[in-house]
Amino acid sequence: MNLIPMVVEQTPRGERSYDIYSRLLKERIIFLGSGVNDDVANVIVAQLLFLEAEDPEKDITFYINSPGGSVTAGMAIYDTMQYIKCDIATLCMGQAASMGAVLLAAGTAGKRYALPNSRIMIHQPLGGFQGQATDIEIHTKEILRIRKDLNNILAHHTGKTLKKIESDTERDNFMSSVEAQKYGLIDEVLVKREDVEGAADNG
């Protein structure tokens, strides 16, 4: 059962109700709270483009609690994050696994955060193919290309060497928020909201 809370605001013209995600969008907050698929990616890409059109100079805050999902859908979000002019602060609550971890690391340098009990996991893309040998070979080459692309992205955003990333993503690699900070996936572990305000003031 999918329950989405509604928020009621008083305006000069009377009451106006928003679903909670639309209300957060008014505050330039985007929330990824599910697996990553094409539908989810299309909504997030549209939100990013809308917020850039509204004000290309103001930051966007991107909250992430995701087990990951489709690489192609995730890359659509990633590329849009890099494409738009706005700085994007990413913040993990709960988990950021697989593609979720890539999106967390893809935030603007110095503005990537996690809450204390968050779990972050990186690994190589998964693949399970059946069919003719030639089809399996085609898919194998594609998943190896995707793995190389993802490893290059993680190397770019963490400052780690490609060889180190390749080794560390060979199997599921779970990290605490503190470990993710040391690794370079995030910049700071936040306990209170004031922490991010202080970090912004110091940036």
Curated annotation (Swiss-Prot):
Pfam families xref list: CLP_protease
A GO BP annotation: protein quality control for misfolded or incompletely synthesized proteins
Keywords, alphabetical: Cytoplasm, Hydrolase, Protease, Serine protease
Active site as annotated: 98 (nucleophile), 123
InterPro entries documented for this protein: ClpP, ClpP/crotonase-like_dom_sf, ClpP/TepA, ClpP_His_AS, ClpP_Ser_AS
Known EC number: 3.4.21.92
The reaction(s) this protein catalyses: Hydrolysis of proteins to small peptides in the presence of ATP and magnesium. alpha-casein is the usual test substrate. In the absence of ATP, only oligopeptides shorter than five residues are hydrolyzed (such as succinyl-Leu-Tyr-|-NHMec, and Leu-Tyr-Leu-|-Tyr-Trp, in which cleavage of the -Tyr-|-Leu- and -Tyr-|-Trp bonds also occurs)
One Gene Ontology molecular-function label: ATPase binding
GO cellular component: cytoplasm; endopeptidase Clp complex
CDD domains xrefs: S14_ClpP_2
PROSITE patterns: CLP_PROTEASE_HIS, CLP_PROTEASE_SER
Membrane-spanning intervals of the chain: none
Annotated compartments: Cytoplasm
Main subcellular localisation: cytoplasm
Function summary: Cleaves peptides in various proteins in a process that requires ATP hydrolysis. Has a chymotrypsin-like activity. Plays a major role in the degradation of misfolded proteins.
NCBIfam families, per the entry: clpP (TIGR00493), PRK00277.1 (NF001368), PRK12553.1 (NF009205)
Subunit text: Fourteen ClpP subunits assemble into 2 heptameric rings which stack back to back to give a disk-like structure with a central cavity, resembling the structure of eukaryotic proteasomes.
Family from the record: Belongs to the peptidase S14 family.
Protein name as annotated: ATP-dependent Clp protease proteolytic subunit
